[in-house]
Amino acid sequence: RYLAEHKLSTEKVSPRKIINWFSKNEPLSGYGKMILGESHILSGDKAKGIALIKNGWISADLSKSELRFFRKKYKKYLDANDYIKRADHLAWNSDHWDLKRLIRYLPKDYELLYTARHILMTKGYGVDQAIKNVPNKFKNDAGLNYDRLKWRRKKGRLESSTEILLKIRNDKDYLVRP
């Protein structure tokens, strides 16, 4: 079913058929949600369609060309917040290639945050400068601290890893992903 969802297109299959196909089973992928959303919009249910596109955008597994295609196709439905949610999803899943492609479309503050997270994930050069460039409002971001902790642990810096663990808040609101 997952592979079948990636073959669907409203240009090849009527929106009504796509909606009927998904009525038996919910979409498995973000890609499937976006195609179902587009079908709902073409069938007149704009609110449901936009919600599905926004939801699917966050987790869709897109190649470089598909990212460009869907950005252009859905630009009137997607806003900066949707791009931020997608970047967050990609960063938490350590999908650094897709994150790198998305970074340039983020607002400047978030671009700096996710650039730092990307460099930490890939063990790239300029970690200290990238972290220094992160705006103060994101210095204590759960994802950034997670990536810093992982980076330090892999570099054998156990003392400074412990320092991060002890300074972060230990509550449900802060710990986005347990």
Question: What function would you assign to each model-found segment?
Answer:
Residues 1-178:
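Alpha-helical solenoid repeat scaffolds
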